[in-house]
A protein has these predicted regions:
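Catalytic core of pol beta-like nucleotidyltransferases
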Residues: 1-14, 22-24, 39-129
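Short glycine/proline-enriched turns and hinge-like loops at secondary-structure junctions
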Residues: 27-30
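Short beta-strand->loop micro-motif that forms the acidic, two-metal-ion catalytic signature
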Residues: 33-36
Length: 129
């Protein structure tokens, strides 16, 4: 089955690779992070079937549904994504802009969480001495 047929069967309009393989930094045993977006809601069974179908093209697929991804994960996907399939031209570029915007909207909250965690770790270190 071709990537296009997989996309048609599951109403996928976007398939991208991200993570270490997309960055060219994979090591032996690295999985292949694949993010997909469907025009319909994907069930867990759909996700497992998509991952199994894509295993014919990529080793050890770890599948992510873009519609269910957190802003932090969207930022990671958008940062180093490599296009595998897009139903129409420019959809990939539109996704990268969307992912960046979602991440940047979340970033102030993420920064506050990091600062709070750092303060808690610093306080713990001081108590340990």
């Amino acid at each position: 089955m071709s990537v296009e047929k997989i996309a048609d069967e599951f109403s996928l309009d976007l398939i991208v690779m991200f993570g270490s393989r997309a960055r060219g930094q994979s090591i032996r045993g690295s999985d292949t992070d694949i993010a997909v977006r469907s025009t319909r809601t994907l069930s867990r069974d759909d996700e497992l079937r998509i991952a199994a179908a894509l295993d014919a093209f990529f080793p050890d697929v770890d599948l992510c549904d873009i519609r269910k991804a957190s802003p932090l994960l969207l930022g990671a996907i958008g940062q180093d994504a490599k296009l595998i399939y897009e139903r129409r031209e420019s959809l990939f570029e539109e996704f990268k802009i969307f992912a960046w915007n979602q991440y940047m909207d979340f970033k102030p909250q993420l920064d506050r969480i990091r600062e709070r965690n750092k303060a808690e770790i610093d306080a713990f270190d001081e108590d340990s001495e």
